[in-house]
């Protein structure tokens, strides 16, 4: 799994940072999943190596403009481009009314299948919102001025390495039987011998995981969702010095994000959603926020637009 940041600013865009959006690339299935879609996101796609034709799912954290104003334009453009994949959208229950109103009033034609999955705060804690053979997506409510949700994506464990030499030594004929054994299935050969696939496979290979957490102040729900994740992407709107503002506006400081990362025992933390007040050259700069976070959680990076991160697995196993 690979992350591409398409927008890392809070509230309004700057010359170097667009507002919130990030893409998750799933090369094994030629799909893209988008998390938030601030104004100008489709322009950011054009400046990246990502293809909107692969876009399959969009996850919206909350209904503030810097996270959703790019959505109607992107959806309309997908229709004009003849997107045939269809689109699933996940987000607060108000998302449907927002899109219905804009698309209807602008006479925008959505020519592809679209389904909106509305989320409610009361029933969303650690809620599974999508699952298939490869991935599990979970959400949880956050603490913000409007209903907001964090998302976690877990890649399911893969079968362990198949011992081909052992199978050959036992004169098991190659072909579809090897595939069955690799999946852990019990196979009966024509000569009557029975083999358990688990006897030919090493330990399961843990899948990668990441959590996207914005907008929120420090939240126990976020801590629980992030437990053991390989990568935590967490908002850091304010510096520790401006923690009073963070509490007033229900945002996080860099140190709050680092505290979540440390207590959740994640592999890596990336700070995003930075206030424009911390532009380079100002008294407090983005690098100062990074230093604050690293004093608590050393394996921290500062997001910037078009930064790409290959999610690296670490040994921690999430509690269930």
From Swiss-Prot:
GO MF annotations in UniProt: 3'-tRNA processing endoribonuclease activity; zinc ion binding
Ligand binding (Zn(2+) 1): 62, 64, 144, 215
InterPro entries per record: Metallo-B-lactamas (IPR001279), RibonucZ/Hydroxyglut_hydro (IPR036866), RNase_Z/BN (IPR013471)
UniProtKB keywords: Endonuclease, Hydrolase, Metal-binding, Nuclease, tRNA processing, Zinc
EC number in record: 3.1.26.11
Enzyme class label: hydrolase
Cofactor note as given: Binds 2 Zn(2+) ions.
SUPFAM superfamilies (UniProt xref): Metallo-hydrolase/oxidoreductase
Catalysed reaction equations from the record: Endonucleolytic cleavage of RNA, removing extra 3' nucleotides from tRNA precursor, generating 3' termini of tRNAs. A 3'-hydroxy group is left at the tRNA terminus and a 5'-phosphoryl group is left at the trailer molecule
Cofactor dependency: Zn(2+)
Signal peptide: none
Binding residues annotated for Zn(2+) 2, in chain numbering: 66-67, 215, 273
Active site: 66 (proton acceptor)
Function: Zinc phosphodiesterase, which displays some tRNA 3'-processing endonuclease activity. Probably involved in tRNA maturation, by removing a 3'-trailer from precursor tRNA.
Similarity annotation: Belongs to the RNase Z family.
Quaternary structure (record): Homodimer.
The name this protein goes by in its record: Ribonuclease Z
Upper classification of the organism: Bacteria, Bacillati, Cyanobacteriota, Cyanophyceae, Synechococcales
Gene from which this protein is expressed: rnz
């Amino acid at each position: 799994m690979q992350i591409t940041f398409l927008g890392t600013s809070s509230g309004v865009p700057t010359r170097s940072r667009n507002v919130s959006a990030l893409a998750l690339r799933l090369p094994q299935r030629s799909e893209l999943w988008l998390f938030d879609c601030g104004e100008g996101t489709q322009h950011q796609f054009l400046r990246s190596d990502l293809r909107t034709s692969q876009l399959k799912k969009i996850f919206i954290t909350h209904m503030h403009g810097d996270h959703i104003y790019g959505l109607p334009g992107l959806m309309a453009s997908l229709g004009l481009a003849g997107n045939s994949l269809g689109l699933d959208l996940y987000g607060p229950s108000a998302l449907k009314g927002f899109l219905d109103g804009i698309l209807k009033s602008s006479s925008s034609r959505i020519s592809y299948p679209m389904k909106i999955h509305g989320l409610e705060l009361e029933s969303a804690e650690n809620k599974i919102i999508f699952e298939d053979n490869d991935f599990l997506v979970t959400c949880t409510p956050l603490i913000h001025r409007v209903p907001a949700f964090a998302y976690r994506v877990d890649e399911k464990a893969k079968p362990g390495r198949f011992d081909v030499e052992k199978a050959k030594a036992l004169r098991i004929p190659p072909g579809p039987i090897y595939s069955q054994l690799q999946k852990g299935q019990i196979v009966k050969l024509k000569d009557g011998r029975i083999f358990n696939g688990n006897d030919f496979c090493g330990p399961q290979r843990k899948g990668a995981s990441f959590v996207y957490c914005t907008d929120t102040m420090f939240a126990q729900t976020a801590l629980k969702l992030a437990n053991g994740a390989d990568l935590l992407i967490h908002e850091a709107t304010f510096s520790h010095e401006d923690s009073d503002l963070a509490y007033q506006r229900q945002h996080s400081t860099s140190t709050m994000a680092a505290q979540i990362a440390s207590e959740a025992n994640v592999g890596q933390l990336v700070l995003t959603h930075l206030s424009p007040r911390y532009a380079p050259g100002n008294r407090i700069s983005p690098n100062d926020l990074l230093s604050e976070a690293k004093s608590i959680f050393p394996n921290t990076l500062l997001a910037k637009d078009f930064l790409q991160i290959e999610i690296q697995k670490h040994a921690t196993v999430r509690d269930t």
